[in-house]
């Protein structure tokens, strides 16, 4: 596909397609062309594509003619602008309406306009019609802003990447067969819609996304649905090319998006129809099954460690066909309701054709699921609050009043005689609270400081309402005038409250909470309730008790939101027959945990549970107190309570009253109100852990008590007896997965499971929970999907162009967007897109974003990152220095390890290329022979790209001048907050004096709790908005770095380059080659597939794995456990006295006996490779997390040369730690080469092992001097 407009990109296109060598000159020429390309040029290039007829689709004309917004809004009795609901209670999203009548033209871009200032002015004065118009215009603009950058940039990068020839795969030795852009239906659609909207106007872009906001094309055909529609079309267009999606499925996805734009509300339609693709593919597969293989995993004991073992492959046969009830009726009804009957019919027919579980069938499911809309859904904050925070659960069997004792302060205790199922909830929480409070660790000053510090962050926390509540009782707070920090942070709050007694700060526990918003993909937007510091403080007993339950009493997982942090093998195990899984979710979980049932029982259980262990003790700065005890009717006594119980009393008062939610809706002028709600706050430290503990406790009560009491079916009873929450029910928050282990007899019958599920639903209704249960032969947990042991990446949940922009703050200044661009690349790696196409597209995208116009002083400059910066950040090159194309894998690490790895693969080629191009040196270097590599690397800007990539991409704000006295007051206040317990301070002082004796001079700036107040202060500074000067300083630093001439890489990378490897035999496959383990990672996607089968999949929880590689699992916020760990390891490596390690541990707050014992253990213990490598900042790359990197380090990197020992490769006896570093270097080289990960053998260490070790030791001693 050739285009006359794109000819200037010719050499760049050839270089990213592997035809010619990549070079920085070609890259920068292309970057200039990208930045010179106007929006109209992009549309002209689209005009040149001769699309095939089958890439076209009927575009409903109704998407261009939409009614006015007037009839969709009204002002309610409380004077709030509200959305009229026509299609259902939740029809409160942006209506698809015309917008041109509300716009005034832009001064210079006359074809574009934004909301008329006259309307905004009338809205401020309270005019109802103007308020309605402003609300509609602003929320439509917000919907259009949910993108990372203008869509044209992503389209242009696609046009450039796809202008190259078909890609040749050197591993499969064939050209790939993904159809070119002439078959791309979403791209055709994008072009036609833009063409139609712009009509006769000279400008073609339907809207402009600029830093000043969104500007709409002044066209009568422009509607609020066009931006989200275009955003979805661009996502689909890119995915079709880079993931090799089936064009006929993508066309169905396009039709659904067009229907959404033709409907009354795009986001609402998307939300209602998001199940179309998964329901008719993933959840309907294999009604007939005639073959295939699934993995056979064993879950090792204890199950809570989440370790699995691969036992081979299980052949699949008809007996494992889908037996779960059919969803056909539901699917057909959905199709009829939303006009999608044809699509659903076609999908179901195609799904039935797959009767074998293999690479093709799982790729089909993945392709179909990728076609779901991937926009971030928005609605006004007013509607979000009134949707999410007005539900109250219907409790069918409430706890009878007579089952409670009289009040003890704010709580009542549940009597032993109660017959309510609440007694089991009470018992679990009581037991956990008693055990938690009896642990000495709970009372340790460091542990309390960690708890007090965990919510001291640069995020907001309803500070204004807190200050108002304290002013109301005449408590004045220091205002730290003139301090250049962001006041709306919990760091600032902690400093203000540090020296106030609890009797004052406790007033703020009942203060209003402010409002945060989160927009999500394929889920309703959520409002966040950021609690203030005193509210978080009294939540601690709730958090600690829930943590105890989750750690000791159930099978919960903790994970972040990234795919790599979740326990993937759990889903593989759960979905592999004969095991079966049931996905159990609690609908509206926050709203279902209220004082009426849960919180009243839990608060009483904690209050009574901690009583015996906490007598008279304060906790986390909350003193002991006295309450009225009227638990025995007619008797009133004063009862002393401990600090922990005092917290529970205050928390109970808050939970009982509910939260007062202050809504200030920036999208709707005049929508400013306070809303009382009993819904559990989503911003509490207790939220997730609390829900998890309740989720498992209620399930345990069902399996052991309620279930058996409500059925006499012997099969159901036998099934319930075989299940426990310690072995079969995994949960996190409101998400649960019930795993029914396969027996020697095979699967449990579908009817038996159905009967149990009906019981669970009925059980939940008793206490107000609505269990949302899916039993369909697949496993879904934490938004990961599995079928027959194969993960199905949901590509639509990682939108390429979309970005959550929940508030109206301006977008982040360049070059911060480069982190997002690299994030797009890594998402694609985790999701298993077609590796060559994805690298090519991302190379094009990175080039498009690599250049920026800026003002430095009075002159215009262009800032340009060389291509090497992107290589340093992890984007693998395609072809360099005369190498073959496509020899670098996307598993190449980032940073120094990645640079070392690719250079190691082609070092002889680089030397030859440099010499051939005239870079010859008089002196021979051990690394590049007789090549004058320093001159070469400066000429090709390799050094400059390397050093620019290491510079910060956000302006530095912590250097601002501040009045010295105020700054010292502020850091002193933070220090008082942290060191509230004098014992903690004396430990750190003791550590410091010991350090002077035994540690001084060994390493610089050892981590200490005394650093934390200053780090918090810096954090509060960094949260502020950057000034123009700070932006200019950052640009200036980048420019200077680009102009500088360098003589070497960093000391670490120079040391790494002394090590050479020999790549040898391929290893045996770790898994059966016929097993689909991740849809899309299959023989058609050569490199990821060969890595997966040669290295093997990760078979344990990565989080648990890394937790075991730390000496200290937790520390106060502001210190980093990895930094403490590497300081301790460096001390050990540098031969420090054990007393220096003890001093270091005292400085981070451990008590002396504990510090001494841990120091002794560190001195003697055999330390894991991953942990030891931290001494030189090496860490496992994210892209390896789904692979078994641990066994690769242990078994496939050989430190004994293939032909026997050499003097140069021997490692001195006292430098055993070098082995860990060498294993990382070897693994980096093996993973960076495409194809099977081979066994690597150490070949040579230039200068020998001792000299290398000494280089690292010198580096360790110097590290931290500059900090």
From Swiss-Prot:
It catalyses: RNA(n) + a ribonucleoside 5'-triphosphate = RNA(n+1) + diphosphate. InterPro entries: DNA/RNA_pol_sf (IPR043502), RdRP_5 (IPR012915), RNA-dir_pol_reovirus (IPR007097). RNA-directed RNA polymerase that is involved in transcription and genome replication. Following infection, it catalyzes the synthesis of fully conservative plus strands. After core assembly, which consists in recruitment of one capped plus-strand for each genomic segments and polymerase complexes, the polymerase switches mode and catalyzes the synthesis of complementary minus-strands. Belongs to the reoviridae RNA-directed RNA polymerase family. GO terms for molecular function: nucleotide binding; RNA binding; RNA-directed RNA polymerase activity. The keyword Thylakoid does not apply. Its EC number is 2.7.7.48. This is RNA-directed RNA polymerase lambda-3. The keyword Lipid biosynthesis does not apply. It is found in: Virion. Coiled coil: none annotated. GO terms for biological process: viral genome replication. The gene is L1. Keywords: Capsid protein, Nucleotide-binding, Nucleotidyltransferase, RNA-directed RNA polymerase, Transferase, Viral RNA replication, Virion. One of its GO terms (cellular component) is viral nucleocapsid. Gene3D superfamilies: RNA-directed RNA polymerase lambda-3. Residues 555-792 form the RdRp catalytic domain. Pfam families: RdRP_5 (PF07925). It is an enzyme of class 2 (transferase).
């Amino acid at each position: 596909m050739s285009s006359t407009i794109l000819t200037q990109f010719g050499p760049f296109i050839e270089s990213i397609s592997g035809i010619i060598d990549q070079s920085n000159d070609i890259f920068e020429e292309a970057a200039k062309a990208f930045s010179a390309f106007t929006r109209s040029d992009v549309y002209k290039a689209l005009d040149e594509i001769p699309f095939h007829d089958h890439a076209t689709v009927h575009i409903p004309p109704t998407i261009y003619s939409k009614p006015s917004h007037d009839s969709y809004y009204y002002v309610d009795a409380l004077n709030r602008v509200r959305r009229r609901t026509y299609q259902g209670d939740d029809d409160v999203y942006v209506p698809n309406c015309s917008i041109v009548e509300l716009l005034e033209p832009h001064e210079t871009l006359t074809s574009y306009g934004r909301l008329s200032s006259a309307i905004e002015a009338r809205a401020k004065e309270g005019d109802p019609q103007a308020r309605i118009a402003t609300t509609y215009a602003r929320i439509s603009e917000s919907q259009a802003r949910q993108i990372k950058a203008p869509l044209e940039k992503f389209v242009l990068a696609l046009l450039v990447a796809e202008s190259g020839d078909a890609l040749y795969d050197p591993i499969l030795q064939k050209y790939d067969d993904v159809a070119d852009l002439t078959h791309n239906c979403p791209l055709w659609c994008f072009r036609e819609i833009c063409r139609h909207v712009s009509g006769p106007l000279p400008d073609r872009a339907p809207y402009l996304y600029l830093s000043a906001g969104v500007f709409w094309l002044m066209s009568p055909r422009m509607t609020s649905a066009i931006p989200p529609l275009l955003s979805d079309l661009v996502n689909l267009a890119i995915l079709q090319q880079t993931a090799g999606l089936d064009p006929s499925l993508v066309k169905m996805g396009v039709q659904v998006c067009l229907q959404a734009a033709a409907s009354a509300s795009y986001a609402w339609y998307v939300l209602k129809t998001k199940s179309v693709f998964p329901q008719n593919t993933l959840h309907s597969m294999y009604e007939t099954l005639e073959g295939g293989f699934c993995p056979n995993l064993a879950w090792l004991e204890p199950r809570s460690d989440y370790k699995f073992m691969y036992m081979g492959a299980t052949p699949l046969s008809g007996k494992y066909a889908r037996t779960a009830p059919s969803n056909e009726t539901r699917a057909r009804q959905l199709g009829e309701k939303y006009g999608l009957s044809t699509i659903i019919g076609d999908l179901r027919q195609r799904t039935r054709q797959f009767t074998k579980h293999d690479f093709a069938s799982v790729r089909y499911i993945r392709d179909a699921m990728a076609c779901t809309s991937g926009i971030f859904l928005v609605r006004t904050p007013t509607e979000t609050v009134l949707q999410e925070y007005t539900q109250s659960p219907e409790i069918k069997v409430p706890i009878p009043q007579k089952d409670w004792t009289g009040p003890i302060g704010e709580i009542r205790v549940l009597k032993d005689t109660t017959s309510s199922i609440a007694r089991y909830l009470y018992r679990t929480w009581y037991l956990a609270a008693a055990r938690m409070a009896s642990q000495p660790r709970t009372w340790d000053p460091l542990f309390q400081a960690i708890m007090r510090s965990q919510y001291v962050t640069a995020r907001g926390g309803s500070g204004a309402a807190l200050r108002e509540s304290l002013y109301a009782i005449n408590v004045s707070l220091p205002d730290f005038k003139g301090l250049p920090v962001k006041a709306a942070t919990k760091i600032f709050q902690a400093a203000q409250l540090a020296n106030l007694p609890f009797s004052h700060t406790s007033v703020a526990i009942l203060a209003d909470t402010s409002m945060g918003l989160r927009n999500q993909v394929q889920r309703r937007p959520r409002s966040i309730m950021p609690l203030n510091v005193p509210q978080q403080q009294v939540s601690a007993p709730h958090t600690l008790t829930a943590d105890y339950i989750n750690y000791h009493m159930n099978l919960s997982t903790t994970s972040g939101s990234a795919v790599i942090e979740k326990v993937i093998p759990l889903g593989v195990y759960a979905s592999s027959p004969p095991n079966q899984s049931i996905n159990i979710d609690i609908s509206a979980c926050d709203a279902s945990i209220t004082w009426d049932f849960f919180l009243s029982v839990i608060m009483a259980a904690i209050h009574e549970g901690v009583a015996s262990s906490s007598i008279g003790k304060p906790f986390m700065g909350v003193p002991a107190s006295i309450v009225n005890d009227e638990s025995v009717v007619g008797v009133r006594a004063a009862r002393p309570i401990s600090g922990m119980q005092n917290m529970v009393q205050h928390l109970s008062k808050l939970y009982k009253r509910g939260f007062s939610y202050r809504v200030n809706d920036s999208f709707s002028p005049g929508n400013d109100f306070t809303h009382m709600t009993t819904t559990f706050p989503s911003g509490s430290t207790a939220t997730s852990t609390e829900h998890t503990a309740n989720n498992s406790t209620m399930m345990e009560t069902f399996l052991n008590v309620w279930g058996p009491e409500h059925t006499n079916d012997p099969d159901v009873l036998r099934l319930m007896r075989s299940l426990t929450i310690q072995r079969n029910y995994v949960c996190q928050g409101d998400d649960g997965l019930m795993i029914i282990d396969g027996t020697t007899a095979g699967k449990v019958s579908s009817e038996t499971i159905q009967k149990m599920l009906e019981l669970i639903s009925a059980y939940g209704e008793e206490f107000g929970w609505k269990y949302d249960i899916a039993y369909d032969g697949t496993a879904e947990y934490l938004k990961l999907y599995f079928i027959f042991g194969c993960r199905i990446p949901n590509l639509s949940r990682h939108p390429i162009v979309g970005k959550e922009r929940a508030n109206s703050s301006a977008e982040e200044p360049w070059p911060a967007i480069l982190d997002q661009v690299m994030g797009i690349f890594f998402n694609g790696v985790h999701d298993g897109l077609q590796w060559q196409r994805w690298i090519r597209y991302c190379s094009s995208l990175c080039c498009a974003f690599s250049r920026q116009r800026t003002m430095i002083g009075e002159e215009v400059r262009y800032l340009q990152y060389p291509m090497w910066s992107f290589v340093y950040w992890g984007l693998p090159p395609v072809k360099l220095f005369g190498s073959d194309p496509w020899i670098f894998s996307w598993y190449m690490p980032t940073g120094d390890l990645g640079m070392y790895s690719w250079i190691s693969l082609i070092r002889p080629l680089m030397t030859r290329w440099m010499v051939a191009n005239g870079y010859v040196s008089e002196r021979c270097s051990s690394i590049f022979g007789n090549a004058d590599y320093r001159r070469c690397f400066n000429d090709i800007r390799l050094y400059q790209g390397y050093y620019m990539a290491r510079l910060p991409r956000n302006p530095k704000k912590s250097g601002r001048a501040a009045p010295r006295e105020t700054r010292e007051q502020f850091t002193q206040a933070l220090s008082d907050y942290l060191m509230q317990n004098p014992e903690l301070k004396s430990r750190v002082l003791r550590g410091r004096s010991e350090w002077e004796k035994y540690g001084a001079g060994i390493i610089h700036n050892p981590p200490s709790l005394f650093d934390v107040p200053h780090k918090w202060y810096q954090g509060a500074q960094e949260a502020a908005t950057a000034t123009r000067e700070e932006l200019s300083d950052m640009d200036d630093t980048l420019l200077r770095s680009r102009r500088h001439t360098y003589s070497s890489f960093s000391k670490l990378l120079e040391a790494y380059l002394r090590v050479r490897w020999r790549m040898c035999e391929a290893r045996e496959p770790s898994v059966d080659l016929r097993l689909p383990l991740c849809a899309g990672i299959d023989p058609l996607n050569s490199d990821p597939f060969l890595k997966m089968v040669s290295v093997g999949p990760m078979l344990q929880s990565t989080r648990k794995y890394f937790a075991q590689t730390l000496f200290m699992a937790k520390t106060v916020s502001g210190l980093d456990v990895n930094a403490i760990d590497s300081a301790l390891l460096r001390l050990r490596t540098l031969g420090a006295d054990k007393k220096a390690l003890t001093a270091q541990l005292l400085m981070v707050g451990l008590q002396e006996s504990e510090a001494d014992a841990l120091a002794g253990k560190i001195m003697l213990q055999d330390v894991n490779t991953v942990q030891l490598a931290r001494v030189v900042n090496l860490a496992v790359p994210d892209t390896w997390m789904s692979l078994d990197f641990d066994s690769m380090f242990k078994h496939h990197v050989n430190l004994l040369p293939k032909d026997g020992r050499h003097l140069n490769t021997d490692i001195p006896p006292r430098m055993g730690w070098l082995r860990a570093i060498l294993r990382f270097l070897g693994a980096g080289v093996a993973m960076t080469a495409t194809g099977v990960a081979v066994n690597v053998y150490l070949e040579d260490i230039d200068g020998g092992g001792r000299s290398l070790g000494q280089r690292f030791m010198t580096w360790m001693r110097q590290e931290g001097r500059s900090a």
